[in-house]
Swiss-Prot record:
Signal peptide: none annotated. One of its GO terms (molecular function) is protein-containing complex binding. This is ATP synthase F(0) complex subunit e, mitochondrial. The gene is Atp5me. The modification Phosphoserine is found at S68. It comes from Mus musculus.
Length: 71
């Protein structure tokens, strides 16, 4: 087995600093994007509900035309 290599404290400091900065950036970015994603999901749900209602009405109208007395 190969013995561990001595790494400069400056390099260790740089690595851990980059790790911590990356984690902080990710947390900040996540908190920025989360409300936007929730808003997009809410809008998509409202749009889906509206389209489902239109399809239901269209289907009822088609059934009403098929069941008309004047056949």
């Amino acid at each position: 087995m190969v013995p561990p290599v001595q790494v400069s404290p400056l390099i260790k400091f740089g690595r851990y600093s980059a790790l911590i900065i990356g984690m902080a950036y990710g947390a900040k970015r996540y908190s920025y994007l989360k409300p936007r994603a929730e808003e997009e999901r809410r809008i998509a749900a409202e749009e889906k509900k509206r389209l489902d209602e239109l399809k239901r009405i269209e289907r009822e109208l088609a059934e009403a035309q098929d069941d008309s007395i004047l056949k």
